[in-house]
Amino acid sequence: MIVLLSSGNLAVTQAVLHRVTSSNFKSNEDSEKKELPQNLKEVADLYQAAELVGDAVREVYQHDGKALEAQGAGFQVSFLLGGQIRGEPMRLFQIYSAGNFIEATTDTPFLQIGEHKYGKPILDRVVNYRTSIQDGIKLALISMDSTLRSNLSVGMPVDLLIYQRDSLKQTMRRRIDETDPYYQNLRGYWSSALQQAYQQAPDPDWQDT
């Protein structure tokens, strides 16, 4: 099972997606890579899948990059690619607009794309390699709520997908909107908890009151 998430220019995203799902995509770099798969269904492992997406990004840049930049649009796109192929370990990659990529590790167990500066601090403080699925769901939604509150360009709904090791299928997929009872309860609880924590934090001892 392979999951591909994107952020950035929608036209570029769709062009990349077409290439990695097409049965006849061949990168200009094929001559340098033997037995390169033609689409995501043919990859032997997730690293090879990340390479394929990266090659597709560079191919789209060669085709559209200069025209986009001439119009001031820029070539901005990034992807998260994760999942598992039978017999291989689960892996997660972040692919940049240059086609290069990094992989999540035990020391850096999560990756983010898009508008993440508002929601990243809670993840940096709490998430680790042993974080449970339930805690991961809570933290992901709290992180998204922080982004939604601070950036008007980001909106609902939130699509949540859970994958468990070796299942090779979706464990759960849920679309969460503003009316979702759990999300409403969680954001209210988190807001109250932050206010309480702020009130209980010690006052500075170097300032006159």
Outline where the language-model segments fall.
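Conserved short S/T/G-enriched processing/targeting/catalytic segments and their helical context
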Residues: 1-66, 113-120, 124, 128-131, ...
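A two-mode feature
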Residues: 63, 71-209
